[in-house]
């Protein structure tokens, strides 16, 4: 007999709450000085040695960036296979596309390294826009209804 694994513990979180959690986490990291903006992290070939050299260069300015566990999450503007493979062999760093950024991965790491800030802002504004959440027109409809009643 024993325990059965048929229970599903998955919880659905609506889009507005996910966006709010991402915004709160981003703002907290920024206020704590744990967001690092880098011009580019593009790599021509998947080389862990190059990725390690980049992290060591960044680590001179930020203590704890080269620690042994959960030091940084690198958010790339787009999925670059060479860059992702280069950082995949490093145990203390996670890398992923900015479009896939979530609060859990940001909270697991001490620092958030964002490559190409201009593209990052565009990607985040698309991800966090109110139109994507289906929210903005609510005020306009309420105003029209109120005007129609008068």
Which role fits each region the language model picked out?
Residues 3-150:
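Extended polybasic, low-complexity segments that bind anionic RNA or targeting/receptor surfaces
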């Amino acid at each position: 007999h024993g325990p059965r694994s048929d229970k599903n513990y998955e919880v659905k979180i609506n889009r507005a709450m996910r966006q709010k959690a991402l915004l709160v986490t981003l703002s907290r990291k920024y206020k704590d000085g744990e967001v690092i903006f880098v011009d580019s992290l593009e790599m021509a070939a998947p080389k862990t040695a190059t990725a390690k050299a980049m992290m060591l260069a960044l680590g001179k300015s930020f203590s704890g960036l080269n620690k042994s566990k959960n030091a940084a999450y690198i958010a790339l503007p787009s999925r670059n296979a060479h860059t992702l493979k280069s950082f995949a062999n490093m145990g203390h760093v996670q890398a992923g596309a900015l479009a896939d950024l979530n609060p859990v991965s940001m909270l697991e790491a001490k620092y958030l390294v964002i490559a190409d800030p201009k593209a990052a802002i565009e990607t985040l504004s698309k991800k966090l826009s109110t139109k994507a959440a289906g929210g903005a027109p609510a005020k306009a409809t309420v105003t029209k209804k109120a005007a129609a009643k008068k």
